[in-house]
Each structure stands twice: as structure tokens, then as C-alpha cells.
Amino acid sequence: MSDLVRVAVDAMGGDYAPVEPVKGAVEAVNADERVKVQLVGQVDVIEKELQKYTYPKERVEIVPATEIIETGEPPVNAIRHKKDSSIVVGMKKVRYGEVDAFVSSGSTGAVLVGGQTIVGRIKGVERPPLAPLIPTKDGVSLLIDCGANVDARPSHLVQFAMMGSIYMEHVVGIKNPRVGIVNIGVEEEKGNALVKETYPLLKENPYINFVGSIEAREIPNGAADVVVCEAFVGNVILKLYEGVGATLISKVKQGMMTSLRSKIGALLVKPALKETLKSFDASEYGGAPLLGLKGLVVKTHGSSKANEFKNSILQCISFSEEKIPQKVQEHLADYKSSREAAKDGV
């Protein structure tokens, strides 16, 4: 049992709590015997939902939490005053090593504040970024940052690139991942002040495989494995991605139902088409890890259904087994030392 990856799940956060978080947790433990889930929230409500399912009882626990942080609440006040909320209780589980990860679709602000103040940042990390996987032509890329730091500095973006590279190599399995910075052109002199200042720092960084600037239209083509940007740009890209994906799926389904011929054709291509459209479904990729913390915190969409919870829980396995926080701390410390040595002329 000690080898199991322990994941706490906020059963009270999000638009469809507790139904979808509980269902997703059950699907996760049924899908992979390496994971154990602790459902955090109101006991009677969670127990009622669990009665619907068959699952290995020894790998699902309930952790009591009587309070709920609502989306509209000021995050700092909510974290400070609602000590028995599902988010605070779950975060403390990570902080004290009682679980390996925490997954929540609750208030984004509360998750960001709780991650930094309760779980805590890794030594050397300036700003923890949110980093979701997004689909590309041949696989996935990591979009970093997509919502945590709207006023980032060049040093923050450099750290995002390094943390993103570690994640893609050790969790996703892409060796020597390519890092690109989002820009309005591919030329080195293009961009706003932030991009222009960040570019040379990324170019000279020996810990990443920097491929230069990438335009937004090249992101779906897989121009980079790690797509670096500040949070405002990243959030716009993410929301556009999700909107286009949902629209594409809807339009294809509509087109297949327009005539008898199209319906027959749809039946012939259904298996391949279903698999292709599945790649545009955001829930297939799980939530966005808040990288740079001492433990793993994953933020899922507020509208997450069971499938996204399941995939978010399962992505915690590789993160935990590969000891990502330790790798991040080591790489950042080495980078800092090399920068200081260069300044001293060593």
C-alpha cells in the first residue's frame, strides 16, 4: 500500500460537485491499481454518491471537510478564514506529506493562493505557473503559463521554460523537448518588451532546447513541445483552443446528419472520426498542474466532468513517481549557480 500514489480530490468544488468528482475518482481507481484517492468534503454527500458505484474500497477514502469556498469569494480571505474547506484541507494533506497530489475544480484564485501559501513554493521558484497540455497535430504541447501570472518578468518566463521542459521530458516522455516563446513573428527582434528581454535569456540557457519565437498559428502544428508565454496571452490561447475544439466537434456532428448519404458515410468512418475528434476534447488531457510547488496541485476546469477528473488523477502518477519537485529545485539551483559564475567571470 505504501507504493500507491495518493491523490486527494476536492469533492465539493466545481459546477458539478460532488457528482462528477466522485465519479471521476471511482473511474481512476478502477482504471489504475497504482492510485489511491481521498475524497475531501462533506461525508454524507460523498457517501451517497459512492453508493452508486463498484470500486476497490481499500483505495477510496473520505476526508471530512465541512466548508466550501465559492467561486466569487475573495481568495485570500477564503483561504485564511475557511480552514475546514475542502481546498484548504486537501492542500494541507499535500503540505504534510499525507498525499502526493491534490486535484480541484474549485475557485481558481483559491487554488492559486492555497498552493503558494499552504503547499509552498520550491526554493528558488519565483512564480508557480499553470501548465495544461493542449493537442497538436502529432501529439501534445505544454502551454505555460495559462492563468497564474499576468504580470510576469523575463526571469519568470525563463523558469517557466525550465519547469515545462522537466515536465514534458519526465511526465509526458518527450526527450529534449523543444521550447518556444509565443510572439507576433519568428524574427528575434520582434515582440513586446517582455518577449524581447526574455528571448536572449532563453537562447543562452543550457538547460533547455530553445527553438526561438513561434506564432500562435504554429502551436497546433506542434512547433514547440513547451509553449512559453505570460498568463494573459496563455489564457487567451487556451480559451480559443477550447472554443475552436468544441465548435469543430459540433460542426462535424451536424454535417454528418444533413442527409442519408452523409449518415451512411459517417457510419463508415465513425471509429477513425471518433478517435480524431477525441483529441480535441480538453477533458482527455486532465487539468493544469501548478508547477513550482513542493507538492503537486492540479487545477481542472470549473465545468469538469468525470473524465477530466479521472485523467487529472492519473496524470499525478508519473509526476509523483518521477519526483518532479526535486528535479525542478536541482535544475533551478544549477542554473542560478551558472549565472552567478558567469557574472563573476569564472
What are these regions (language model features)?
Residues M1-V9, D15-V19, E47-K48, Y53, ...:
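N-terminal charge/polar-biased segments
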Residues E20-T71:
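N-terminal glycine-rich anion-binding loop in soluble enzyme alpha/beta folds
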Residues V19-E20, D32, K36-Q38, V43-E47, ...:
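Glycine-rich phosphate/diphosphate-binding loop of Rossmann-like nucleotide-binding domains
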Residues A17-P21, D84-G97, A101-G115, R121-I122, ...:
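Short glycine/serine/threonine-rich phosphate/pyrophosphate-binding segments
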Residues Y55-V99:
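Phosphate/nucleotide-donor binding subsite
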Residues Q116-P129, L133-L143, A223-V227, A231-A341:
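Glycine-rich phosphate/nucleotide-binding loop
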Residues A8-V19, A148-V158, K299-A306:
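Short, glycine-rich nucleotide/cofactor-binding loops
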